Amino acid sequence: MSDVEKASLPPAIFIMGPTASGKTALAMALREYLPVELISVDSALIYKGMDIGTAKPNAEELALAPHRLIDILDPAESYSAADFCRDALREMAEITAAGRIPLLVGGTMLYFKALLEGLSPLPPADAAVRQRIEEQAKEVGWEAMHRQLSEIDPVAAIRIHPNDPQRLSRALEVFFVSGNTLTELTKTSGDALPYQVHQFAIAPATRELLHQRIEQRFHQMLAADFEREARLLFARQDLHTDMPSIRCVGYRQMWSYLSGEIDYDEMVYRGICATRQLAKRQMTWLRGWDDVCWLDSEKPTEALDKVIEVVSA
């Protein structure tokens, strides 16, 4: 698409960044200066009852700056990048029709990429095929299923960990249903996003600063009674660590603690380490991102001014 064609499209803003980088604060501040409506791009914030461990904006913040696509699912439900694209496009169209600018804020980079580039049409879920895969996994184990995927689709097998049964079974299911591998089907993207997108990434200037912010926020979550929140979920007995909700950083480690597998101090240590690993993956995505304007989270006023300047140009 040419620059002239892009300029004729309605505007949208992406604010991306690693966890604990100040994305939400920047997005909320922008509401005072630009006619924006916020859409959350976060695979953890979609879940109801998972507030403290996800650093979800609190009730007061949401009253001041409502976020769409927050609290839309029960933790027992799953949500795909395709689901996100469908919902986000609907919300963006509604915001644009009202004469305002959709501002998408979050750290789930796969969602941003899927929305920006479009998704290849994959075969719909097939319950019977999925059941056969899960039954086979019970017999031989997920390690063996991963070896099977390595023979069918070695590229996908490199990306998918043997301890990720949801993604592993989906990759196998796609092949058994369509006869094509997940890698083959995702080589071609779908329709590009019909918006002029202004893309920003916010992060501290150094890794050390980001690590400090992550550790500080994890301890703040614990002080806000994250353990009690996790215990309420644990007590339901219909949730487990194979589910995307409980695989979220912090919750997975809290689950191990509540199960008696590790003690409290080990849970805290692992939770902080897992959050740092998440931030590292997010930064890896962003360093390879095209057309992104970097902002320093330690200089919030300058970051705010830069976004306003770029969007208003």
UniProtKB/Swiss-Prot annotation:
Annotated site location: Interaction with substrate tRNA: 108, 130
InterPro entries: Dimethylallyltransferase (IPR039657), IPT (IPR018022), P-loop_NTPase (IPR027417)
Residues involved in substrate binding: 19-24
A family per Pfam: IPPT
Membrane-crossing segments per the record: none
Binding site for ATP: 17-24
Catalyzed reactions per annotation: adenosine(37) in tRNA + dimethylallyl diphosphate = N(6)-dimethylallyladenosine(37) in tRNA + diphosphate
E.C. designation(s): 2.5.1.75
Region annotated Interaction with substrate tRNA, chain positions: 42-45, 166-170, 247-252
Superkingdom classification of source: Bacteria
Keywords: ATP-binding, Magnesium, Nucleotide-binding, Transferase, tRNA processing
GO molecular function: ATP binding; tRNA dimethylallyltransferase activity
Positions of disulphide bridges: none
BP GO annotations: tRNA modification
UniProt cofactor(s): Mg(2+)
Function: Catalyzes the transfer of a dimethylallyl group onto the adenine at position 37 in tRNAs that read codons beginning with uridine, leading to the formation of N6-(dimethylallyl)adenosine (i(6)A).
NCBIfam families: miaA
Quaternary structure note: Monomer.
PANTHER family: TRNA DIMETHYLALLYLTRANSFERASE
Protein family membership: Belongs to the IPP transferase family.
Name of the protein in question: tRNA dimethylallyltransferase
Name of the coding gene: miaA
